[in-house]
Amino acid sequence: MQSWVNKLWYQGHPLRFALWPLSLLFGFVTWLRRVLFSLGLKKAAKLPVPVIIVGNITVGGSGKTPTVIYLIELLRKHGLKPGVISRGYGVEIDGVRAVLSGDRADSVGDEPAMIVARTQVPMLVGAKRIDAANLLLSEFDVDIIISDDGLQHYQLARDIELVILDGERRLGNGMLLPAGPLREGPWRLQNVDHVIVNGGKALQGEVQMTLQPSAWLPVSTKHNAGEPPSKDSPLVAMAGIGNPQRFFDTLAQQGYQVEHTQTFDDHSAYSESVLNELASGRMLVMTEKDAVKCRDFAKDNWWYLAVDAKLSASFDQQLLAKIDRLVADK
């Protein structure tokens, strides 16, 4: 399914023209919804603390989660106490739920499980971000909120909007859903505070971000880990993220010998039997997002590659200066 969608959205498949009328309808509905909020006919809830939206205008992975983790660490160093809210993609949540370190990804969502495992940040997930934000403020010592995704969730007023773009895929064929990958038109990029480009090359006015490998870590928390992956031994690599090829390319650039690669759809659930068959006793490597879904049954020779987002000092300074102004005005 994912490979077919990639052909449609990123490789010029002619079927996109047949879907164009549906894209026009989708575009009208999203435009009308935004207009209703901008005119005040639909109300956006304002919070007593600054709200940062980390989102995108395309469907699929672009690097939002590493960006959220980067922001959490940046804000903490600046003396702030961030909290995070998320929809919890792909899971059914009754009301609002706190995400705890060790929670299963199939209960709270892949990205929330990964964010909390890495940062132990106060984080709530729920279908209604407003409810999650209000509960976060009432139950935790938080003075700034980061929304993981939610750029198009206009019910929540925001102070800063950060859009993450895949620097290699950019906007694909430039068409709205379902003919293309866009949730909103390219014009939306002109209305956000920063466009952050993950990989590739940022254009003028955009912010360059790179994902730098930091360490090999064992997937399992139950076994004593053996030796981490070596560049002298063949590996089996898997990835169930928005752009799996980026992970495989990273391994190649680092000089690892990848014997076999296996892609899964983004947000796939994994079974022990499928991954055991894939690995067949060999060393299996994966992304951090995949690892949070495999910990309960991982073998001691399964490893994930932790990566850290890197952005410029000038971006940090601009962002923190705006946050300081917002805090003073709240």
Swiss-Prot record:
Binding site for ATP: T58, V59, G60, G61, S62, G63, K64, T65
GO molecular function, one term: ATP binding
UniProt-recorded name of the protein: Tetraacyldisaccharide 4'-kinase
Organism field: Shewanella halifaxensis (strain HAW-EB4)
Keyword annotations: ATP-binding, Kinase, Lipid A biosynthesis, Lipid biosynthesis, Lipid metabolism, Nucleotide-binding, Transferase
Family affiliation: Belongs to the LpxK family.
Function as written in the Swiss-Prot or TrEMBL entry: Transfers the gamma-phosphate of ATP to the 4'-position of a tetraacyldisaccharide 1-phosphate intermediate (termed DS-1-P) to form tetraacyldisaccharide 1,4'-bis-phosphate (lipid IVA).
GO biological process: lipid A biosynthetic process; lipopolysaccharide core region biosynthetic process
Record-linked InterPro entries: LpxK (IPR003758), P-loop_NTPase (IPR027417)
Pathway it works in: Glycolipid biosynthesis; lipid IV(A) biosynthesis; lipid IV(A) from (3R)-3-hydroxytetradecanoyl-[acyl-carrier-protein] and UDP-N-acetyl-alpha-D-glucosamine: step 6/6
Chemical reaction(s) catalysed: a lipid A disaccharide + ATP = a lipid IVA + ADP + H(+)
Catalytic EC class: transferase
Gene Ontology cellular-component terms listed: plasma membrane
The keyword GTP-binding is assigned to this record: no
EC number: 2.7.1.130
